[in-house]
């Protein structure tokens, strides 16, 4: 039972200063007032807007959101009145004086400064776009970053007035990909340049391959494993490190964000990974009277328990509310970490993930197993069912779920949300098949895709099947591995994995004489399910068998150049 020491809190009247608004700052200020009418609460915001829908900004640029006013979640006037807050916009905190417990505030329009005392100081400065020192960047006349409403206004005004024909987006993270879509919505040709070999870092390469395929369908030019060497001719020419040249009318720089931690650093507060502000489980910095929340802080990864930076709106909002509770005496409120659950729209595709990916687990030397399952978003016999591909990453011995990724046109978000909830509750892959999820033909199947991926993972944990991954099978076949494709002959026109032998599943029992007993057998099909059935059949006959996880569909999407016909 959570305990709040009400009498002690109510007898105290404190001056609480919140630095920064939007998700974290606005959330903590509102909750603080709901918990106490006595405290003096001051919110100091460098910009003009204290609370806006930063995740909606690309969609206003693209014309999907048509009313600018809808981006403004709270105005200064409305929030001041409702919550009795002293809100000071266009005011920047330039110094923290820890010993005196004061801050120095600068009016950004007049440059005048003054000091303000505090009993409790809360930092919610957020994160800012990374702007590297690219030669020619200062001379680029149509180069933009996207963080706030003024940035949005500048980009939209440029598009409306100049009507650019081509845009270059540098960076393939969430903001970059969302900007690509919304620029295409405006009829602008787009080239995306990304240093890595994929978009959207939270998902793994093979899942991103589906996103790449979808973006190409929407006429987006993708340039991977290349960076910007220089901007020339006032930013109308982008010269890449490979020597390639892109002629463009505008540039969106979206290579990532860095924490706004200089204020904390100058005050001597301890910093963490990537320059984040280091905090404990109660959001206290190295100074017990100074707290920090939001994109600028170091958080614990819920899965690996390592320190990291996860700049997302969900954690910032929850941290704000929790910190207000902590300040008001909730003795057992502790922040247990962030899983980084996220979702993004990429044209007609929804892409979501939770937990950690393979890249992180490899870096930390944590052993793991992977399974891919493709199932319909709802019952296949009900109209308009579309495939959902789910990737589950887990511990083969314990069944602990490390992470999940999913993509499709419909029903993706709710599947990831269910798995995220299971992870938070410390459920294992063995528990997923028993989750009693809502079912009716328009919404799901009697065995939901979450149940199905649980069955597939449980089969591995229980030893009913072994698998190999899409990136392993070519090497195996090249070194003498015996690969059977159990699809029907008419399916082979889609292509095959080089070196595979076709024995349709329903003929396999009658053709066992063609399957050598002295070799390990590998099975592939279209998606993996028939491969599992074939693997079980052969295992019962005494064969050593492994199933190609995800089947030919996964292999062919990720490695189309290796498919044979």
Locate predicted features:
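Mid-to-C-terminal Rossmann-like scaffold of FAD/NAD(P)H-dependent oxidoreductases
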Residues: 9-15, 21, 34, 296-409, ...
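Beta1-alpha1 glycine-rich phosphate/pyrophosphate-binding loop at the start
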Residues: 11-92, 130, 180-203, 332, ...
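Rossmann-like dinucleotide-binding cores of NAD(P)H-dependent redox enzymes
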Residues: 72, 166-168, 174-230, 312-316, ...
